[in-house]
Swiss-Prot record:
Assembly with partners or alone: In plastids the minimal PEP RNA polymerase catalytic core is composed of four subunits: alpha, beta, beta', and beta''. When a (nuclear-encoded) sigma factor is associated with the core the holoenzyme is formed, which can initiate transcription.
Catalytic activity field: RNA(n) + a ribonucleoside 5'-triphosphate = RNA(n+1) + diphosphate
InterPro entries (UniProt xref): DNA-dir_RNA_pol_insert, DNA-dir_RNA_pol_RpoA/D/Rpb3, DNA-dir_RpoA, RBP11-like, RNAP_asu_C, RNApol_insert_sf
Region feature Alpha C-terminal domain (alpha-CTD), mapped onto this chain: 264-323
Stretches for region Alpha N-terminal domain (alpha-NTD): 1-233
Record-listed E.C. numbers: 2.7.7.6
Keywords, sorted A to Z: Chloroplast, DNA-directed RNA polymerase, Nucleotidyltransferase, Plastid, Transcription, Transferase
Annotated Gene Ontology cellular component terms: chloroplast; DNA-directed RNA polymerase complex; mitochondrion
Domain statement: The N-terminal domain is essential for RNAP assembly and basal transcription, whereas the C-terminal domain is involved in interaction with transcriptional regulators and with upstream promoter elements.
Record-given protein name: DNA-directed RNA polymerase subunit alpha
Swiss-Prot/TrEMBL GO biological process terms: DNA-templated transcription
Originating species: Morus indica
Gene: rpoA
Compartments in which it is found: Plastid, Chloroplast
Function: DNA-dependent RNA polymerase catalyzes the transcription of DNA into RNA using the four ribonucleoside triphosphates as substrates.
């Protein structure tokens, strides 16, 4: 823990952790370097890594809560200091670590008076709490508070919608991203007759992953995205004589089926890697559209049925894809 003196060898390319610390159970910091890089490479890698760190790494959150004592989200319960809304906000802040897939059930059942904290959550075996001291509620009277919880592993974030209330349960805004922030900076220097660069990456996490683990996972995700390009030519040769269905079926420019490298690559390009406006991105994520291939397999009419999606958004998507 602490800062090391940075020394860079001109060859070969190397990476190093130059600073690492835990500011709290829910705030880790790491600083890394990669060098030597040719001019322009540091920015290319830095931008890609930042996007992968913030958008491609999965995390685990509480996404839904249910209790018979809750008439509606903005109600209060006798014997509990916090309102229902405040309890839901406290549940949103709970940081979990897991390797689960899909959703799991958890629960809280505590008799007052006393404080309810994260350590009172009864979790499935595959899930653990990063900070057991996180506050949930204060029971001021001898009442019993029982809450059923839903835990989910995903990536990005999900904003609750008014029509997402089911059987007296309440959705919770989910921020799945274990990386709180990521920045990159570049140090340029001259080595002989060459202009070279050092890339510095700064990563802050919520404690469910260390910055080093986040860096490794983001790197793996980027590699997985690029691997298909190595096989694209072979894939095209094997399929050039086969009949195919139209890949794009909205907008006149996309009416004819075309098996190009770009179209094949769309399967592996996620919408959060693009420059889509936040409103358009949220519309698509709510409709479970994660990749551009999934997006373009919808007709324009189907897209227009998505809540808050507008006709001009179609043109914006086409401009982003440059098709």
């Amino acid at each position: 823990m602490g800062q090391e003196k940075v020394t860079v060898s001109t060859r070969p390319l190397q990476w190093k952790c130059v600073e690492s610390r835990a500011d709290s159970k829910r705030l880790y910091y790491g600083r890394f370097l990669l060098a030597p890089l040719m001019r322009g490479q540091a920015d290319t890698i830095g931008i890609a890594m930042r996007r992968a760190l913030l958008g491609e790494i999965e995390g685990t959150c509480i996404t839904r809560a249910k209790s018979e004592k809750i008439p509606h989200e903005y109600s209060t319960i006798v014997g509990i200091q916090e309102s229902v809304h405040e309890i839901l906000m406290n549940l949103k802040e709970i940081v979990l670590r897991s390797n689960l897939y899909g959703t799991r059930d958890a629960s809280i059942c505590v008799k007052g008076p006393g404080y309810v904290t994260a350590q009172d959550i009864i979790l499935p075996p595959s899930v653990e709490i990063v900070d057991n001291t996180q506050h949930i509620a204060n029971l001021t009277e001898p009442i019993t508070l029982c809450i059923e919880l839903q835990i989910e592993r995903n990536r990005g974030y999900r904003i609750k919608t008014p029509n997402n209330f089911q059987n007296g349960s309440y959705p919770i805004d989910a921020v799945f991203m274990p990386v709180r922030n990521a920045n990159h900076s570049i140090h340029s220097y001259v080595n002989g007759n060459e202009n070279q660069e050092i890339l510095f990456l700064e990563i802050w996490t919520n404690g469910s992953l260390t910055p080093k683990e986040a860096l490794h996972e983001a790197s793996r995700n980027l590699i997985d995205l690029f691997i298909p390009f190595f096989h694209a030519e072979e894939h095209l040769e094997n399929n050039q004589h086969k009949g195919t269905l139209p890949l794009f079926n909205f907008h006149g420019r996309l009416a004819k089926p075309r098996k190009t490298k770009k179209e094949i690559a769309l399967k592996y390009i996620y919408i959060d890697q693009s420059e889509l406006p936040p409103r358009v991105y949220n519309c698509l994520k709510r409709s479970n559209i994660n990749t551009f291939l999934e997006l373009l397999n919808n007709s324009q009419e189907e897209l227009m049925k998505i809540q808050d999606f507008r006709i001009e958004d179609v043109k914006h998507i086409l401009d982003v894809l440059e098709i």
